[in-house]
From Swiss-Prot:
This is Methylenetetrahydrofolate--tRNA-(uracil-5-)-methyltransferase TrmFO. InterPro entries: FAD/NAD-bd_sf (IPR036188), MnmG-rel (IPR002218), MnmG_N (IPR040131), TrmFO (IPR004417). Belongs to the MnmG family. TrmFO subfamily. GO terms for cellular component: cytosol. Its cofactor is FAD. It comes from Desulforudis audaxviator (strain MP104C).
Length: 439
């Protein structure tokens, strides 16, 4: 096959898909509309720009996303290579300096001899034999309409919410303490402890705060993993104590006791000058954010360098439309990757791009596309999105509940059980890659 593969979108999924193609010797034409046309959330023209959080979540193999990242490393992932090279302290998680990370991904692809970058908006789906659509949760209206016409399915909409960022120097260090939960890993988080009285005042202000106006054409449907903090708070007076303000595993060194509630701040850049409010994705008006979030102990005089915003997320009904190799059932050769495919999260999006890129490369070379084994994190996640109930389909993060049961007697302790899943997955992946000639 001649002419190469067209990849639309240079986010995490499109960048990873492009890399998997060129590392197998397949030429790529990569379309990215930014910076000529930006989305409501993106600020730059860099590839793989992170707009919500700078965390790629847990590192340990006892966490499913940690396993997914390790599988990606073993599959030659560009996203993981750049993330590892530009990580910042985050305890047991992998967090990155978002600017250095995106710049590294951009440089690796734009400098590659097999990559042709086109900085323009695509409003119709290319008619080429091999196309990967990786336009992400903020797919332009024109392309979304085109995809709707092609699939015959209505898109589902919900809102992702972006957390605010404050400067380190504006945080009152006398009111916060540095620690990770249960003392695990580096003491990477700044913790703002609250007494019961402080929490009650904060909760009352939060639920009464004015929210930004949404577009009338968008329904308010939230993914549970990225709920706005005010939506969580509105579910009950104590709901936040089991969510972003949970105090478990933390002890205030000044009192020797666990606080009633804790707001965690996570380093957002390598220099350590910026911190984001963990779990504080929000749709409050900016003035309300300053008023309410300044009630958090230690943030009374905080300088907000970015306020939270909300934006639409668009994804297809994968159980109806997608094959397990991520090709559209109605049009062989057209792959859907990233959050558009119905996976949720940075790492999951990149992983879907990896699978789409690998399979597009195989088709380009006249080989059969592959379906990852369900025992692997890649296989378990994709198996879920293509087999879930189409009537109630929601985006999904990777988790061990998606994996086939372990053989033999059930392991009772969760860490040991999860580690057994991870060990099986990595062994199965290695054998499968060798078997398929992808090792």
């Amino acid at each position: 096959m001649s002419g190469g593969v067209i990849v639309v979108g240079a986010g995490l999924a499109g960048a990873e898909a492009s890399w998997q193609l060129v590392r197998r010797g397949v030429p790529v034409v990569l379309y990215e509309m930014r910076p000529r046309k930006c989305t409501p959330a993106h600020k730059t023209g860099d590839f793989a720009e992170l707009v919500c959080s700078n965390s790629l979540r847990a590192e340990a193999l006892t966490n499913a996303v940690g396993l997914l990242k390790e599988e990606m490393r073993r599959l030659g992932s560009l996203i993981m290579a750049c993330a590892d090279a530009h990580r910042v302290p985050a305890g047991g998680a992998l967090a990155v300096d978002r600017q250095l990370f995106a710049a590294a991904v951009t440089e690796r692809l734009t400098s590659h001899r097999l990559v042709t970058v086109c900085r323009e908006e695509i409003t119709t789906i290319p008619t080429a034999e091999l196309v990967i659509l990786a336009t992400g949760p903020l797919t332009s209206d024109a392309l979304a309409d085109e995809l709707r016409r092609l699939t015959g399915q209505e898109h589902l909409y919900f809102f992702d919410a972006v957390a605010p960022i404050v400067t380190l120097e504006s945080i009152d260090q006398d009111r916060v303490f540095r620690s990770s939960r249960y003392g695990r890993g580096d003491p990477a988080y700044l913790n703002c402890p609250m007494s019961r009285e402080e929490y009650e005042r904060f909760w009352e202000a939060l639920v009464a705060a004015e929210r930004a106006t949404r577009h009338t054409f968008e329904r308010e449907t939230h993914f549970e993993g990225c709920l706005p903090v005010e939506v969580i708070a509105a579910r009950g007076r104590e709901t936040l104590l089991y969510g972003p303000l949970k105090p478990v595993g933390l002890v205030d060194p000044r009192t020797g006791e666990r606080p009633y509630a804790v707001v965690q701040l996570r380093q957002d850049n390598r220099a350590g000058t910026l911190y984001n409010l963990v779990g504080f994705q929000t749709n409050l008006k900016w003035g309300e954010q300053r008023r309410v979030f300044s009630m958090i102990p230690g943030l009374e005089q905080a300088e907000f360098v970015r306020y939270g915003v909300m934006h639409r997320n668009t994804y297809i009904n994968a159980p109806v439309l997608l094959s397990p190799n991520l090709m559209l059932k109605s049009r062989p050769g057209l792959f859907i990757a990233g959050q558009l495919s119905g996976v949720e999260g940075y790492v999951e999006s990149a992983a879907a791009g990896l699978v789409a890129g690998l399979n597009a490369a195989r088709l380009y070379k006249g080989l059969e596309p592959l379906v990852f084994p369900p025992e692997t994190a890649h296989g378990a996640l994709i198996n879920y999105i293509v087999t879930a109930d189409p009537a109630n389909f929601q985006p999904m993060n990777v988790n061990f509940g998606l994996f086939p049961p372990l053989p033999g007697k059930r392991v009772r302790r969760r860490p040991e059980r999860n580690l057994a899943h991870a060990q099986r997955a990595l062994e199965r992946l290695a054998a499968w890659l060798t078997e398929k000639g992808e090792g």
